[in-house]
Amino acid sequence: DEAWAEAERSRIGEERFRREHECEFLIYDETLVNSVRLVELEGKDPIWVQGQVRWYSKPKPKHTYMVALDPSIGTGGDYAAIQIVELPTFKQVGEWHHNMTPANQQIRILQEITKHINDTIMEQDSTATPQIFYSMENNTLGEAALMRVMDIGEENICGMFLSEPIRKGHRRKFRRGFN
């Protein structure tokens, strides 16, 4: 009955109630976005596709863009992903993911994305100074991506490479990217 359901929701929470009593497949692990909200989100079709990159809006002058790579080995298992986010709105403007692209090519795709953002902004306003930042995970798989960035040269990728600051008291060698 409804009174029992309301009391049970209050006792165990909406997410657990929906998972246990309404048989919804909600993620149990902690996520950045609440799993109930994730289930309610609706997909949006891209406004255009450039290769395997899906664009949801056109980069604009006077906005800042963050391009983040989560690399993978590229052999058909785990997917590599690149998210393109407009700041300060945190609006997703584009994305790429693939599980057969090797790490060195993942960096080429990141490079093409940052160049596209830069060129698109400059086409709209030739006096603009595009604000583009990029980074990547630096775990074991990320090491190959970081080496590729070193091979290409950071100066050949539009934008500024962001990395974790060295934590006070840590003597560990500095590594580019984020853990």
Language-model segments: residues:
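Gly/Thr-rich phosphate-binding beta-strand-loop-beta motif of the actin/hexokinase/Hsp70
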Residues: 59-87
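Mg2+-dependent endonuclease catalytic cores in nucleic-acid-processing enzymes, primarily RNase H-like
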Residues: 86-179
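C-terminal nuclease/phosphodiesterase catalytic domains that cleave nucleic-acid phosphodiester bonds
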Residues: 15, 20, 24, 28-32, ...
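Functionally constrained cores in energy, signaling, and assembly domains
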Residues: 21-22, 29-32, 37-38, 42-45, ...
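ATPase catalytic-site recognition across NTP-hydrolyzing enzymes
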Residues: 1-69
